[in-house]
UniProtKB/Swiss-Prot annotation:
Pfam families: DCD. DCTP binds at K112, S113, T114, Y115, A116, R117, T136, L137, E138, Q157, Y171, Q181. Catalyzes the deamination of dCTP to dUTP. One of its GO terms (biological process) is nucleobase-containing small molecule interconversion. This is dCTP deaminase. Pathway: Pyrimidine metabolism; dUMP biosynthesis; dUMP from dCTP (dUTP route): step 1/2. InterPro entries: dCTP_deaminase, dUTPase-like_sf, dUTPase_trimeric. Its EC number is 3.5.4.13.
Length: 189
């Protein structure tokens, strides 16, 4: 299993719509010159962006967090260019990009150091072979202060690994519960 380069990422995005929308190079500023947290193709990965729709965790309803029976009222929906995550809390978001992962590929996603150095952890599970959809992102604010997340800017890097052998059963074959997801998707069982 080997990591894939920028050339492979560009080719797969352009010829197979693996990433839409796609930035073939690193974008570090807006068109008017304002600096942003970078996104787009890097040497051996792709820096993904956070869309402007968020679900911010709240404990107003004083419920128990149960992944098998998650209470949707535990979140407050928010849409905007900046999301403020309360201290020691978290928020869900989704990527701007829609992914179509080839059958021979598995990805690993790691948070960008810009956020990690501020105590904001980005968690994303691997994108499995033949999974497609918007990626649901989880941001944990590990600090005792409110934390900002910027929409339409880079938040994490996706690394693509291609296997030397095709899997017997892909995510699509087994009817994965998050296949084709759009928007911020809550836990499913």
């Amino acid at each position: 299993m080997s990591i894939k380069s920028d050339k492979w990422i560009r080719r797969m995005a352009e010829e197979h719509n693996m990433i839409e929308p796609f930035a073939p190079n690193q974008v570090r500023a807006t068109e008017d010159g304002r600096k942003i947290v970078s996104y787009g193709t890097s040497s051996y990965g792709y820096d993904i962006r956070c869309a402007d729709e968020f679900k911010i965790f709240t404990n107003i309803n004083s419920t128990i967090v149960d992944p098998k029976n998650f209470d949707e009222k535990s979140f407050v929906d928010f849409k905007g260019d900046v999301c403020i995550i309360p201290p020691n809390s978290f928020a869900l978001a989704r990527t701007v990009e829609y992914f179509r992962i080839p059958r021979s590929v598995l990805t690993v996603c790691l948070g960008k150091s810009t956020y990690a150095r501020c105590g904001i952890i980005v968690n994303v599970t691997p994108f499995e072979p033949e999974w497609e959809g918007h990626v649901t992102l989880e941001f944990s604010n590990t600090t005792p202060l409110p934390a900002k997340i910027y929409a339409n800017e880079g938040v994490a890097q996706v690394l693509f690994f291609e296997s030397d052998e095709i899997c017997d059963v892909s995510y699509a074959d087994r009817g994965g519960k998050y296949q084709g997801q759009h928007g911020v998707t809550l836990p499913k069982t």
